[in-house]
Amino acid sequence: MKILFIAPRYSGGIGGHAARVAEKLQEYGFDVKLMHAPHLPIKKLKNPSFVLLSSLKAIIGNERYDIVHAFNVPSAFAMKYTKSKKKVLSIHGIYSEQVNALHSKTIATAAKITESKVLDWADKLTTDSKIVKKMYKEKLNVDFEFFYAPLDIKKFSKLKNIEKKEKQVIFIGRDSFEKGIDILKKIETKINGKVVYCTNTKWDYAMENLKASTILVVPSRMESIPQVIKEAFYLKIPIIATNVGGIPELITNDKTGILIPPNDPEILQNSINELLADNKKSKILANNGYEFVINNLTWEILLPKYVKFYEDLVNS
């Protein structure tokens, strides 16, 4: 089977997920290629320039595919013009709401109009969260198929042996409004430990810092399914996270982690300090999280579902 994946980049977020899926499908025997298109390295022009240049690349390209799979709305334009039997669009999170939280009303309105149009271009729509699937059905009456993004546990064997740093609290993610990093920074001086931030680092470096930490904090205002939660589960690092988006699909409060409301610095501060002081609870949460990820979210568990999805689609 010949498949083309399209994403603005193939590291972090949905693009990182695309790269991981491509790698596993290639190992399985599928012929998967990644489209690489340039974009202007200017904040507000990154996506528009990617849309233009990737679409142009698709229009002039002669290669034909069984399936073209676009990851996020900006990739859908190149998907539309790629020569293929079937088209798939994956969205992690409600795209128009993400844009609305980060940009002006004009841009947000344009994103909302664009979102409703591009969804019609795909033969199949997929997402990594039950809540996103539900919200798109309610909002636009469109049907998404749902697949969790698996965790590749084999990669962790490459990490160095790291010495634990007592009472180290870590944030891993983009330095952006929706990730809530400003909320954690606001209370940093009141936390009974050291806070470290991994905001634009290589995966190995971030994971080694996570492995050394006592608690992972995910203070997001908006989320789909953060991959870092699965990574912390596997490394047996207890988690405090906001109960937004798909996070409650992974974290059961007081069982596999601690859930708190978003935008509440005081509750975040108290939750961190209480867990730093409770080693027994930390160990219980860490062990439960590990069992959850091993039993539900590895490639060994989920790869057959991905393979079946592509085979069923190309044969339909």
Where are these regions (language model features)?
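Membrane-proximal helix-turn-helix segments that form the acceptor-binding/catalytic region
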Residues: 56, 106-125
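Acidic anion/phosphate-binding donor-loop and adjacent secondary structure
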Residues: 146-166
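Conserved donor-binding/catalytic core segment of Leloir-type glycosyltransferases
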Residues: 163-179, 185-188
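Aromatic "clamp/platform" in nucleotide-sugar-dependent glycosyltransferases that forms part
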Residues: 221
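Short hydrophobic beta-strand element within catalytic cores of glycosyltransferases
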Residues: 238-241
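Conserved acidic donor-binding segment of nucleotide-sugar-dependent glycosyltransferases
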Residues: 253-254, 258-265, 274-280
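A short, well-ordered alpha-helix in the C-terminal region of glycosyltransferases
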Residues: 267, 274, 281-296, 302-308
